[in-house]
Curated annotation (Swiss-Prot):
InterPro entries: FBPase_C_dom, FBPase_class-1, FBPase_N, FBPtase
Protein residues bound to Mg(2+) 1: 84, 103, 105
Subcellular location: Cytoplasm
Co-factor requirement: Mg(2+)
Broad enzyme group: hydrolase
PANTHER family with a match to the protein in the record: FRUCTOSE-1,6-BISPHOSPHATASE-RELATED (PTHR11556), SEDOHEPTULOSE-1,7-BISPHOSPHATASE, CHLOROPLASTIC (PTHR11556:SF35)
Lineage: Bacteria, Pseudomonadati, Pseudomonadota, Gammaproteobacteria, Alteromonadales
Pathway: Carbohydrate biosynthesis; gluconeogenesis
Binding site for substrate: 106-109, 196, 262
Protein's name according to its UniProt entry: Fructose-1,6-bisphosphatase class 1
GO molecular function: fructose 1,6-bisphosphate 1-phosphatase activity; magnesium ion binding
Record keywords: Carbohydrate metabolism, Cytoplasm, Hydrolase, Magnesium, Metal-binding
Amino acid sequence: MQTLAQHLTSQAVNDSLSHLILTLADTSKAISHAVRHGALAGVLGATEQENVQGETQKKLDIITNDMLKDALKADGTVRGLASEEEDHVVEVSQNGQYLVCFDPLDGSSNIDINSLVGTIFSVLPAPAGELTETSFLQSGRAQLAAGYVLYGPSTMLALTTGQGVQLFTLHPETNEFLLTNAAMSISPDTQEFAINMSNQRFWEAPMQTYIADLLLGKIGPREKSFNMRWIAAMVGDVHRVLSRGGIFTYPTDNKDPKKPYKLRLMYEANPMAFLVEQAGGKASTGYETILDITPTHIHQRVAVILGSSNEVDACLSYHGIDYSEEPNIE
């Protein structure tokens, strides 16, 4: 089996980007170690702090954020970083070539129940000149690499550099990420959907109707039965979609009129959309392709509908949109 380093060489990924990806991977090994120790290391539970999103931070949110910050500051290739746990962008190195956006611990509410969590990251080119928030406001099409690390029964890294999606598994004895799936592919059709049904009454009418039709199964207009899955961590739900197909959605809702969207564009939706498109799926807000959005600020939120291409098209048809054409992933 190829190691991650060997794979990056085989794909002719340039040395500086390879170095950055390996730094992210090595840091995820340390995060995996911290997650595994859990209560034994006293890292479970919440703090009294809130992040810029107004969410109470878990202890591991802060620990993993600091681990990634420290590693990226030492890497030498990074110009700046943006994190879910940082109010503002962080300048790293004047000579850095890359910007890194990340969610250090997606699904951290699952930590205390020993369920799936992960790290999501996106790598962008660093523009010339002074580093400001505007430096980061590039569409998802500009991403040079993206991926996630899933901390589950085994630790797995899903990665794209624009050459498909590869899956690596962390060997528990050698501590190396080894290539275990060279070409992840999302089946175009599915009978699985993932959504937080507790918000049903707050959704827009198109999503209400779409889900209602799925629930009708064989007697409804879709004429087949669907199963619902929900992990409550985007990283886990998207991993399932990449592994066996499906549709994942966190749609617009009016539960809190000031926050109609849940997921963050720069370090959740964009990297996941890049992975999904590279694996043959599609990713949309319901009204526009996620990777085509020009961000307005680093913590911008969007609605997310992604997964099996034909099922995403079916969902979008309820929104009055025809996305039957293949996405442009050049």
